[in-house]
Every structure is written in C-alpha cells, then in structure tokens.
C-alpha cells in the first residue's frame, strides 16, 4: 500500500474537493467497479486515498498509487 506525502495530499484535496464528480479510470481490486463508473467525492484522507460515494451505491476508495480517476 502506498501513502502520499503531505504535499501530495494537499494537491489531491485541491484537485478533488468535496462534492466534485469523479470518473473511475482504473481500480486494482478484486471487487473493482467498472471503468467509467461515476461518483461524488467525499474527501481525501491523510494517506491520499480519495473517498467516493459511487452512483452504484458502493463506497470503495480510489487508493493512492494503485487506482486512478479523473
């Protein structure tokens, strides 16, 4: 598991503010959501993971260093 440093966490929080819409590009998880799944950002934790409420009802995080979204 990768962790972001404080500067990266601050950058991610500016790029993904609470309430912004997110589109999943890639997720490395055995229960991964399909690419293109959309959701709403609930914040970025201190490790750099993006917390998302997906439109499917899932709450899987976008893991820093493993997954990607825009």
Stretches found by the model and what they are:
Residues 2-70:
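Basic/aromatic-rich interaction segments and small domains that mediate binding to polyanionic partners
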């Amino acid at each position: 598991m990768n962790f972001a440093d404080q500067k990266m966490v601050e950058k991610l929080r500016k790029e993904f503010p609470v309430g912004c819409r997110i589109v999943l590009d890639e997720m490395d998880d055995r229960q991964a959501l399909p690419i293109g799944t959309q959701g709403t950002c609930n914040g970025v934790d201190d490790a750099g993971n993006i917390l998302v409420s997906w439109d499917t009802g899932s709450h899987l995080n976008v893991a820093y260093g493993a997954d990607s979204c825009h």
